[in-house]
């Protein structure tokens, strides 16, 4: 059933299950930004996408992969929830700036450039020194 108001969970990590998907659906969430990567490399992130693709098949009546803002309205209209992939770290791009586009093609819509530690894209809050960026300008 469609909900009259638009609700979006801007960041979520969970032990995903049918029960959780039912709860977010019953709560009227039209979209959820789901963390699928913390410190995983590219191959590990791809496995997470594979796992999510299985969930999209198994629970297609409740969730689907969101890629655009229009998918949020689609989810609201259909009474489902659009799942948007996000990364808490840029580790899946490893040292290959071309993987940014590949990650986007796989569904990533959010990528935190830095958090705690130094990455190729910037310096994290735990670093004592700021050595500068390596490929950050090209990424941005």
What are these regions (language model features)?
Residues 138-140:
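Conserved small/polar residues in nucleotide/adenosyl-binding loops
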Residues 1-134:
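N-terminal hydrophobic targeting/anchoring segments and the immediately downstream early-domain regions
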């Amino acid at each position: 059933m469609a909900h009259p108001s638009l609700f979006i969970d801007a960041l979520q990590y969970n032990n995903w299950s049918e029960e959780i998907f039912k709860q977010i659906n019953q709560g009227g969430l039209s979209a959820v930004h789901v963390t699928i990567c913390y410190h995983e490399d590219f191959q590990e992130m791809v496995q997470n996408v594979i796992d999510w693709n299985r969930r999209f098949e198994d629970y297609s009546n409740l969730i689907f992969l969101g890629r655009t803002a229009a998918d949020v309205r689609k989810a609201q209209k259909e009474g489902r929830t659009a799942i948007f992939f996000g990364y808490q770290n840029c580790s899946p791009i490893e040292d290959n700036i071309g993987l940014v586009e590949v990650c986007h093609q796989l569904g990533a819509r959010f990528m935190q450039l830095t958090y705690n530690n130094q990455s190729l894209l910037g310096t994290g809050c735990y670093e004592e020194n700021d050595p500068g960026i390596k490929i950050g300008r090209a990424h941005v």
